């Protein structure tokens, strides 16, 4: 969390520049597709390793394309005002990944969060943690500043509870059991951080309707609305 706090400049990078970094990340993943597929196959982490890697790469390109298209909007009102709605990053987010599809699910949480300018502390799959070490190598060679992506391995609920209680973590996403989700919500009540939890629901991460979308971008931002008068 401290490392993420030192990377606060990421939120000030323009959306266009963040998009370019994510495109570079997607290209680097693409170049190492066979390596990631072999790693998933060797550890038995995925029943469809090549398909999971391909979906991860396509998802990275999709979020790169969306990074500069979700800043906000301007809306006219019936009175002589316009409203400016700005989507701003939370800051540091905690992300708790599930065991299913350990590469794709982890990246499906990280990508929208950093696309919107957040820094993340992400807990990788508890059952298949080694994929996180390979991902670190990709992040380090993709122009992502140090501290923007921080990967942890270990017991999901214990680490999640620590992040939920941490005052410097502004938002938490949790993919795990219903009991774990309840624990996260209770632990975060003292600092009022928003928690997005699957509460035991198992997503099909290969399905774009469940594993990616504008909902993820919306959940990675906080909305600020400004009213501006005009005319006499």
Question: Which stretches of residues belong to each language-model region?
Answer:
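Short beta->alpha linker loops
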Residues: 43, 51, 55, 126-130, ...
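Hydrophobic packing residues within well-ordered alpha-helices of enzyme cores
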Residues: 60, 132-135, 163, 184
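Alpha-helical structural signal in soluble globular domains
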Residues: 28, 57, 64, 138, ...
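Conserved NAD(P)+-binding/catalytic subdomain of aldehyde/semialdehyde dehydrogenases
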Residues: 80, 87-96, 142-232
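Short alpha-helical
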Residues: 31, 35, 101, 129-130, ...
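Glycine-rich loop-to-alpha-helix module at the N-terminal edge of alpha/beta enzyme cores
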Residues: 1-69
